[in-house]
């Protein structure tokens, strides 16, 4: 009788699946370069026959089956394959033991097994609940269950049996208060099918009931709702909880970090992005400091536009003294963030913005000039807010007026070209400031009539423009999970499955608004007026690897554009469906949505549509839309590590790099790249060493076929023009913005930065962050390595075509953009000596050295301990140093410094 069941290591009995045997043997064969499907099938048949002979009518365990595989491989004379299989078993056993150690468990369940060691380390470091001794007391299964349960609680209260969107019902809320006062009694008492509600879930249910009852939308008393819950009347929503649990544990999507950390826990704050106002009076300034403290205490990050503050030296009426100016108050907020230190090791994250017309703009541009690793505004990203009138002045060569915000009067006129030079130079030298294009942000802003003003601030990483006291919940979908293979092994992207998941994630994020525990009442109120959500993407680089598409190619950019178009279209589609049942966001009637407008640039270019946008716009006019904005692309540092995929919309940082652990060193290899090497019989430790020594890149290595070199590109293999085009193509279909780093080589010039800013603006980006390799001035402490010269990145033919078209359309750009010099890699090189000297005189350090290593190195440089302390969170990961004593260099991606080892990120989202 054939064997039908198998016992897993955790004692579970599961169906026997011979394909798992086939997969394991195939991996072992690929390890030693054996490519023979007939031989593979023959061995699999022998193994299955032997299992049936030995365990007729019984239930073998996994070890029994693996012993038979070893024996049959040797009987077939495949001794090298058998050795590889034995080593594979040994590695798997070591991995299991390492996972148990990380999770503080004796046995692993099937959820633990789905995540890599790296993913589990990240979960253990920040996300899983710990006791007072710092010991992990929560499993990944329990984490994702508490997140999934919270996400479905709104469905219970929007059930048609208890909810009426038209209102008109009155409920006595005194009973609700009794439940609130005795939450401990209800901890774990209720459930949705098999999923228990803890007291924090229950508290969020009660809070949402109160909100809906105050609007007259609850048809039944709270006691009746609780009775229904107790009697299983809401158990039909168990499948919904199960589906969100499946999508997260299958690494198909992940919410932003605060949602993973705080769902079903005391803080209950699920958002990462906030903007707080600051007015030109001391009371407002101190209120802003208070607001920042409360938000960052809960784990969020803040954006502040300081442009309303009077300039330095201006009159202070109450004292007849002189004002200290916006930059001084940035230092105040920076100090507050320093004290809060989110989570003990995460620095506070802020975005400080000053608009280009402000009299202190030059001081602002130079605010981080002396930052050589010291705590000079180290809790701030800073950006200059640019408007169309500045670009017009630059184009026309006219003087540009600076305006005192207190009086509205012109203080002086400046040369816009000189200011542009300063801005580009500081970004070149210090990686700050970035730029935000407010006219582009507001060009399609459908919310402006309802809010009565333009958007003038963003969250810390710039991908989420927000009004004052707004917040946004974000989640990212793993694109790599939708690459499937046909019967002949050819890859394709499953667009239908992708559309389904987008809609599930959009609904998840809308529900999150209702169960969010906001840090301030003003944020609660304003967030619910617009109900912004941010459905985003990650795993783009891995998806392109699997599809065999180069990131920096027309085909790659076409894929990015289509993936983002689907993202926004189906997020809107779900938002319309939710609006039909629950109503549109409160400000909907006052917005441009009513006129058929959408905040999406691609909507106005019918020639590039892949989907019926006209039908969608009509549905929005007819039914309304639940969410004021729906898509964004945030940084996903640690979130993408949990999902075991590439970060956000960035190309991969390195294909191979060396990692140091307690037992020695090993090479980390991108999983998709590793599979391809093994499939081609190229995999070897010697090749990994060569790639690691080549900056983690395969460019110029003769052992690697040319077609692989085209597809498997790293961030520094890609010309900055192609980085810009990636951001622009994605921006075309987003309602909000994208967090992306425009990587430049160390020998890039100030002229390159100026060109990048102008091109980003002309391409329709909403902001841009440029990072020149080695420009973090703390890297002067790095130890130079004996590494080979990096192969110089060249722009793709598509990028060249776009560059020429933009400049031909607007000839004035040639005053700032030298097309031939950019294409030849000589743009402004004749000035580079002057630039280096200027860096020295301004910053009191030599020009930053090129990044010499892999994504990080762990050799301890000769730096005093006090200096190391200052560099934590600036150049080195604070978690890896505090926990393991290792100096791990941070890498710059998605506009944010991130640790490649543990996932620590300066950005609260990722």
Predicted regions: what they are:
Residues 901:
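Active-site helix adjacent to the Tyr-X3-Lys
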């Amino acid at each position: 009788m054939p064997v039908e069941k198998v016992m897993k290591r955790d004692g579970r009995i599961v169906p026997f699946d011979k394909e798992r045997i086939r997969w394991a043997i195939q991996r072992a064969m690929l390890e030693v370069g054996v490519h023979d499907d007939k031989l593979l099938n023959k061995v699999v048949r022998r193994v299955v026959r032997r299992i049936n002979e030995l365990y007729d009518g019984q239930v073998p365990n996994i070890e029994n089956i693996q012993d038979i595989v070893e024996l049959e491989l040797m009987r077939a004379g495949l001794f090298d394959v058998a050795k590889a299989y034995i080593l594979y078993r040994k590695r798997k056993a070591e991995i299991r033991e390492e996972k148990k150690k990380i999770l503080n468990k004796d046995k692993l369940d099937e959820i633990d097994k789905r995540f890599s060691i790296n993913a589990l380390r990240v979960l253990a470091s920040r996300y899983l609940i710990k006791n007072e001794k710092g010991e992990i007391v929560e499993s990944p299964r329990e984490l994702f269950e508490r997140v999934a349960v919270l996400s479905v609680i709104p469905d219970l209260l929007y059930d048609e049996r208890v909810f009426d969107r038209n209102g008109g019902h009155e409920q006595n809320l005194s009973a609700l208060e009794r439940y609130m006062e005795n939450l401990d009694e209800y901890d774990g008492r209720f459930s949705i099918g098999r999923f228990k509600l803890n007291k924090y879930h229950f508290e969020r249910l009660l809070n949402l009931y109160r909100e809906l009852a105050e609007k007259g939308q609850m048809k039944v008393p709270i006691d009746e709702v609780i009775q229904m819950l107790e009697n299983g009347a809401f158990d039909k929503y168990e499948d919904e909880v199960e589906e969100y649990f499946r999508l997260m544990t299958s690494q198909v999507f992940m919410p932003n970090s605060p949602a993973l950390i705080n769902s079903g826990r005391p803080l209950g704050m699920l958002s990462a992005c906030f903007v707080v106002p600051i007015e030109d009076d001391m009371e407002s300034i101190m209120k802003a400091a208070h607001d920042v403290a409360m938000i960052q205490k809960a784990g969020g990050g803040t954006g502040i536009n300081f442009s309303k503050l009077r300039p330095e030296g201006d009159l202070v009426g109450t004292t007849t003294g002189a004002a200290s100016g916006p930059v001084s108050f940035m230092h105040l907020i920076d100090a507050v963030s320093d004290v809060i230190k989110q989570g003990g090791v995460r620095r506070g994250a802020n975005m400080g913005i000053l608009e280009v017309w402000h009299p202190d703009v030059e001081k602002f541009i130079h605010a981080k000039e002396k930052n050589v690793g010291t705590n000079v505004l180290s809790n701030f990203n800073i950006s200059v807010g640019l408007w169309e009138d500045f670009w017009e002045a630059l184009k026309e060569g006219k003087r540009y007026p600076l305006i005192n915000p207190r009086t509205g009067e012109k203080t002086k006129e400046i040369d816009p070209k000189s200011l542009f030079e300063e801005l580009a130079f500081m970004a070149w030298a210090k990686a700050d400031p970035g730029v935000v294009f407010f006219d582009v942000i507001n060009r399609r802003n459908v919310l402006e009539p309802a809010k009565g003003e333009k958007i003038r601030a963003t969250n810390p990483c710039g991908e989420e423009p927000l009004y004052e006291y707004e917040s946004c919940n974000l989640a990212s979908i793993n694109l790599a999970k939708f690459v499937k293979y046909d019967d002949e092994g050819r890859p394709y992207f499953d667009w239908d499955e992708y559309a389904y998941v987008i809609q599930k994630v959009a609904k998840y994020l809308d529900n999150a608004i209702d169960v969010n525990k906001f840090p301030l009442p003003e944020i609660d109120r304003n967030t619910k007026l617009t109900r912004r959500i941010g459905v985003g993407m990650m795993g783009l680089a891995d998806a392109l690897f699997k599809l065999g598409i180069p990131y920096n190619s027309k085909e790659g950019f076409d894929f990015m554009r289509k993936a983002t178009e689907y993202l926004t279209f189906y997020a809107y589609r779900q938002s319309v469906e939710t609006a039909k049942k629950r109503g549109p966001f409160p400000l909907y009637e006052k917005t441009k949505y009513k006129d058929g407008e959408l905040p999406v640039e691609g909507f106005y270019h019918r020639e590039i549509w892949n989907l019926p946008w006209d039908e969608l716009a009509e549905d929005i006019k007819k039914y309304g839309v639940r969410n004021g904005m729906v898509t964004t692309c945030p940084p996903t540092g640690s979130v993408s590590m949990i999902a075991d995929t590439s970060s956000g919309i960035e190309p991969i940082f390195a294909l191979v790099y060396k990692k140091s652990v307690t037992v020695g060193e090993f090479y980390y290899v991108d999983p998709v790249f590793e599979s391809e090497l093994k499939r081609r019989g190229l995999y070897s430790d010697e090749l990994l060493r060569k790639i690691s020594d080549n900056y983690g890149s395969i460019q110029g290595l003769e052992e690697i076929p040319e077609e692989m070199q085209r597809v498997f590109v790293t961030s520094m293999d890609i010309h900055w023009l192609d980085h810009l085009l990636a951001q622009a193509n994605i921006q075309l279909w987003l309602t909000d913005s994208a967090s992306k780093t425009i990587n430049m080589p160390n020998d890039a010039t100030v002229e390159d930065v100026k060109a990048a800013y102008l091109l980003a603006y002309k391409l329709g980006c909403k902001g841009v962050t440029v990072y020149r390799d080695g420009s973090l001035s703390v890297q002067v402490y790095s130890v130079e390595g004996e590494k080979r010269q990096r192969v110089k990145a060249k722009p793709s033919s598509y990028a060249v075509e776009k560059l020429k078209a933009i400049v031909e359309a607007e000839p004035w750009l040639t005053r700032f953009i030298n097309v031939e010099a950019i294409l030849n890699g000589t743009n402004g090189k004749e000035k580079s000596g002057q630039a280096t000297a200027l860096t020295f005189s301004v910053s009191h350090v030599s020009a930053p050295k090129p990044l010499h290593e892999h994504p990080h190195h762990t050799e301890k440089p000769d730096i005093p301990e006090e200096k190391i302390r200052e560099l934590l969170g600036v150049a080195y990961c604070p978690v890896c140093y505090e926990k393991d004593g290792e100096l791990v260099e941070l890498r710059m991606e998605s506009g944010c410094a991130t640790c490649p080892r543990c996932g620590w990120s300066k950005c609260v989202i990722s």
